[in-house]
């Protein structure tokens, strides 16, 4: 859980110890990044030798983080305190840009009382 935003984000369709009290709907965070000419040249040279292209790995990691931040912001804007079924998608736009989308279902969750948990585990 992100303490700054207090938004729970999971890839599952449930959150252990929580019950979904309201389903708000699909939300997403999108970002598009340009690889840039310099990055393309360095990546092209590195691809000749094989192995990881660290410039692209860092760019994609940073881009995913930005998409996640935007997804958290979207959750807050619609009044959600959790996102379930979190997924990522990516695509190239032209030959120099990459789009990353983080999406999921915005929900409101509450703690499950200990009595309900005991009944469910019996």
Curated annotation (Swiss-Prot):
Pfam families: YbjQ_1 (PF01906). SUPFAM superfamilies: YbjQ-like. It comes from the Archaea. HAMAP family: UPF0145. Belongs to the UPF0145 family. This is UPF0145 protein TV0671. It comes from Thermoplasma volcanium (strain ATCC 51530 / DSM 4299 / JCM 9571 / NBRC 15438 / GSS1).
């Amino acid at each position: 859980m992100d303490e700054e935003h207090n938004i729970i984000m999971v890839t599952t369709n449930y959150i252990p110890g929580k019950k979904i009290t309201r389903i708000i709907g699909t939300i997403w965070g999108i970002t598009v990044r340009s690889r840039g000419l310099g990055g393309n040249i360095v990546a092209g040279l590195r691809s000749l030798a094989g192995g990881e292209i660290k410039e692209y790995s860092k760019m994609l990691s940073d881009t995913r983080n930005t998409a996640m931040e935007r997804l958290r912001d979207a959750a807050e804007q619609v009044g959600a305190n959790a996102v379930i079924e979190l997924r990522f998608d990516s695509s190239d736009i032209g030959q120099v840009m990459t789009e990353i989308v983080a999406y999921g279902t915005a929900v409101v969750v509450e703690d499950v009382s200990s009595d309900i948990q005991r009944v469910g585990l019996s």
